């Protein structure tokens, strides 16, 4: 679900040349119901995300159907954030705003909004080659003190810890996913931070080449950055993530 929702958000930002919450939600529903943005369908979806999409599907008058109850402070909205910062790489305040707004689609708990904003701050500082204070504060933390479950606070801290203990993309990711528990999302957030800090060249080529739709994803990310920079019109398909037409 981490990758699928990331691709769904990425496509919407490209197609709309910015954040369109209704379109993002429609993409999320297409992933859940129509085998889109996933090679083999929606095989995993969080309870909070499912309930939010259910509410949106029943009444599409508002896209902001994120849950707010005390048990809904999960990590489902920070795991998909990376396209926002790639698109708004040169517009920090817009990026910070959209980071929070996209969370409200499925995860509207105050902690989810707060930590979406924290992720924005970490990434934008990393773009400038700086380590956020939340990463620096994790340097002396022992592995036994790190929790890697689905609670948004713990996921964020685990990702900061993995960055603090390493000095390159590969080692940060390996350390993060080996924390176990909610390994995919801790890895996704760590990858977002590490990618911003070390750059795309730091990602092992063999990892990229082994991905399903590797070429399409790489081209999509390039389009995302270009579109965010000049708002050029590009079209990607929803179904199967096939990249079939580019217009400018």
Range-by-range predicted roles:
Residues 1-248:
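Structured, active/binding-site neighborhoods that engage oxygen-rich ligands
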């Amino acid at each position: 679900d981490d990758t699928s929702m990331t691709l769904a958000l990425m496509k919407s930002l490209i197609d709309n040349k910015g954040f369109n919450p209704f379109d993002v939600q429609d993409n999320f529903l297409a992933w859940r119901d129509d085998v889109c943005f996933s090679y083999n369908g929606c095989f995993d979806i969080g309870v909070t995300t499912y309930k939010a999409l259910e509410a949106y599907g029943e009444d599409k008058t508002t896209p902001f159907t994120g849950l707010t109850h005390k048990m809904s402070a999960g990590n489902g909205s920070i795991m998909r954030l990376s396209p926002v910062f790639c698109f708004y790489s040169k517009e920090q305040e817009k990026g910070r705003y959209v980071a929070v707004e996209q969370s409200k689609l499925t995860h509207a708990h105050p902690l989810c909004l707060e930590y979406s904003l924290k992720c924005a701050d970490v990434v934008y500082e990393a773009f400038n080659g700086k380590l956020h204070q939340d990463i620096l504060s994790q340097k002396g933390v022992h592995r036994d003190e790190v929790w890697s479950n689905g609670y948004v606070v713990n996921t964020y801290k685990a990702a900061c810890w993995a960055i603090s203990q390493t000095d390159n993309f590969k080692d940060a990711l390996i350390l993060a996913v080996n924390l176990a528990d909610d390994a995919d999302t801790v890895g996704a957030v760590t990858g977002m931070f590490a990618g911003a800090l070390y750059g795309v060249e730091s990602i092992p080529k063999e990892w990229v080449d082994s991905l399903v739709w590797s070429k399409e994803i790489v081209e999509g990310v390039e389009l995302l950055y270009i579109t965010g920079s000049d708002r050029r019109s590009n079209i990607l398909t929803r179904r199967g993530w096939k990249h079939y037409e580019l217009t400018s």
